[in-house]
């Protein structure tokens, strides 16, 4: 069946408005992220060797949280990077190598390369771990899997985990729950496609549902958001990954990413990723 230009545009338009929250934040008190509440967690870091799972979205104000905490005297001994790397300069699914930060000498350990969770040797160098990465609230966006892997490493090595909570731009629940017979690296938990939770809430669910191996519990402290509601229209201040470079792409991602199971491209590698669809087999102009 040939898809007409009009029907295609209607399809994209419907996806664009589907589940976009109606509550505006312009007249509300500014959302305060977990990372911004320095006075709440700084005492927990005093005199401790700190590891941080962070990337380009990990900011306090307009400064990277790593730099902000170092300026406050926090002893950061290791940085861990998720998919796309600490600087978000790796493509989706690409292996990211370990490196040393040339300015600080702090090791940057990839959790999207040879290993997916911190090793026992990594954890032995830490007293506490921080997780501070923005998420887009989608089951197959790998940050929640990395969070669970970090929780597992902390539980195995009896190390506390502090989570700086951040808003979910897709703060609604939709889509089928994962069939666990189809469990994979991009789908590890029985949750819907869009789960509606913040990263801190998801961590609490992992603990509460006993989803870590052998039903281990991770000692987590969530620095909760202030002035946040799940139905708020929220735009991430920093693009979460190379191919989610606009608010529209973030909102369309849970729907358009499903086309990765077909011959249809979602615009990766173009200047409009996750806002267009196309394939050589499609006839006509769009």
For every predicted segment, state its role.
Residues 183-254:
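Conserved anion/nucleotide-ligand pocket segment
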Residues 27, 84-105:
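N-terminal beta-loop-helix "entrance" segment that forms/cooperates
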Residues 97-126, 138:
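Glycine-rich oxoanion-binding loops at beta->alpha junctions
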Residues 88-93, 162-183:
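Glycine-rich, charge-decorated loop segments at or immediately adjacent to ligand/cofactor-binding or catalytic sites
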Residues 75-84, 164:
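Short internal beta-strands
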Residues 248-286:
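Internal helical hairpin/lid segments
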Residues 135-147:
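Glycine/threonine-rich flexible loop motifs
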Residues 1-28:
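Bacterial Sec-dependent N-terminal signal peptides
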């Amino acid at each position: 069946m040939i898809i007409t230009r009009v029907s295609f545009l209607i399809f994209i338009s419907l996806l664009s408005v589907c589940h976009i929250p109606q509550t505006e934040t312009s007249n509300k008190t500014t959302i305060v992220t977990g990372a911004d509440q320095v006075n709440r967690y700084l005492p927990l870091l005093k005199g401790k060797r700190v590891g941080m799972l962070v990337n380009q979205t990990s900011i306090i104000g307009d400064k990277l949280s790593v730099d902000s905490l170092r300026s406050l005297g926090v002893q950061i001994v290791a940085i861990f990077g998720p998919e796309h790397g600490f600087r978000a300069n790796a493509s989706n699914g690409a292996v990211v190598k370990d490196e040393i930060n040339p300015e600080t000498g702090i090791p940057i350990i990839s959790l999207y390369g040879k290993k997916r969770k911190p090793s026992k040797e990594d954890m032995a160098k830490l007293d506490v771990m921080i997780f501070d990465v923005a998420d887009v609230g989608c089951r197959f966006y790998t940050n929640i899997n990395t969070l669970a892997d970090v929780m597992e490493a902390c539980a195995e090595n009896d190390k506390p985990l502090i989570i700086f909570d951040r808003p979910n731009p897709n703060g609604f629940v939709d889509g089928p729950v994962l069939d666990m017979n189809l469990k994979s690296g991009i789908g590890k938990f029985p949750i819907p496609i869009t789960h509606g939770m913040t990263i801190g809430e998801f961590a609490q669910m992992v603990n509460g549902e006993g989803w870590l191996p052998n039903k281990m519990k991770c000692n987590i402290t969530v620095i909760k958001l202030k002035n946040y509601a799940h139905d708020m229209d929220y735009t991430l201040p920093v693009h979460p990954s190379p191919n989610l470079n606009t608010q529209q792409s973030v909102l369309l991602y849970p729907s358009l990413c499903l086309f990765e199971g077909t011959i249809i491209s979602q615009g990766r590698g173009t200047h409009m990723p996750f806002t267009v669809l196309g394939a050589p087999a499609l006839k006509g102009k769009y």
